[in-house]
Amino acid sequence: MSRIQQTFAALAQQGRKGLIPFITAGDPDPAKTVEFMHALAAGGADVIELGVPFSDPMADGPVIQRSSERALARGVTLKHVLADVKRFRETNQTTPVVLMGYANPIERHGVDAFAADARAAGVDGVLVVDYPPEEAAVFAEKMRAAGIDPIFLLAPTSTDARIAEVGKIASGYVYYVSLKGVTGAGNLDVSSIAGKIPAIKSRVPVPVGVGFGIRDAETARAVAEVSDAVVIGSRLVQLLESAAPEGAVAALQAFIAELRAALDGAANTAR
């Protein structure tokens, strides 16, 4: 059982919902990424999604695009991201880490080399935004062979056939994009999310995390009531973008702790 699978099994046993925060590696300060990861874990994150900076992040809104641009301007590459995970693992062997990004940096690194290097660094999962499931079976198998969960996106527009295709190759969890468009956009409609989740659950044998548009404890709690986990990214990247450097770590941990309390409150209400 992978570290991600163990985490979700423990959450299910406890009747709790997962909290999956996203930050971009190397932003706003490459020297602080590992410290930010520890702050996320200390605040109550169950899984950490670490963004790999890329020059054309087509699925991301302006907040994460700017974040990626800043990290690239500071020279952050996939190798630096793997080094950050390795440093994080020196003192945290329990919190799963998922790399989220685009195919180009991985393909330039070499898929086989990436699988080996990611595993050696302590990566638990990988979500490649621009790998459609119909074309990702070989990639997914190589990740699983290295002990890494291949994670895929689903959207409101995903057909039953697309959902079933993802169900065949995904492990760890799936990430349901609750809004059409790019990250950080729009307003959440929890009823429409609740209407889509059963179709996913019936075809995908792994937990469902919901993200895009979650900005605060209230929206996180609402989404947690209809999903297995809540994914939050743009709001955290925005927080780090605007926070004073000396207070960024504490602000990040405090915000995650607020979300954690909201999710645990939702779980207690449901019991």
From Swiss-Prot:
Belongs to the TrpA family. GO terms for cellular component: cytosol. Its EC number is 4.2.1.20. It catalyses: (1S,2R)-1-C-(indol-3-yl)glycerol 3-phosphate + L-serine = D-glyceraldehyde 3-phosphate + L-tryptophan + H2O. The alpha subunit is responsible for the aldol cleavage of indoleglycerol phosphate to indole and glyceraldehyde 3-phosphate. PROSITE patterns: TRP_SYNTHASE_ALPHA (PS00167). Keywords: Amino-acid biosynthesis, Aromatic amino acid biosynthesis, Lyase, Tryptophan biosynthesis. HAMAP family: Trp_synth_alpha. The active site is at residues 49, 60. The gene is trpA. Tetramer of two alpha and two beta chains. This is Tryptophan synthase alpha chain. SUPFAM superfamilies: Ribulose-phoshate binding barrel (SSF51366). GO terms for molecular function: tryptophan synthase activity. The keyword Amino-acid biosynthesis applies. Pathway: Amino-acid biosynthesis; L-tryptophan biosynthesis; L-tryptophan from chorismate: step 5/5. PANTHER family: TRYPTOPHAN SYNTHASE ALPHA CHAIN, CHLOROPLASTIC, TRYPTOPHAN SYNTHASE, ALPHA CHAIN. The lineage of its organism: Bacteria, Pseudomonadati, Pseudomonadota, Betaproteobacteria, Burkholderiales. It holds the Pfam family Trp_syntA.
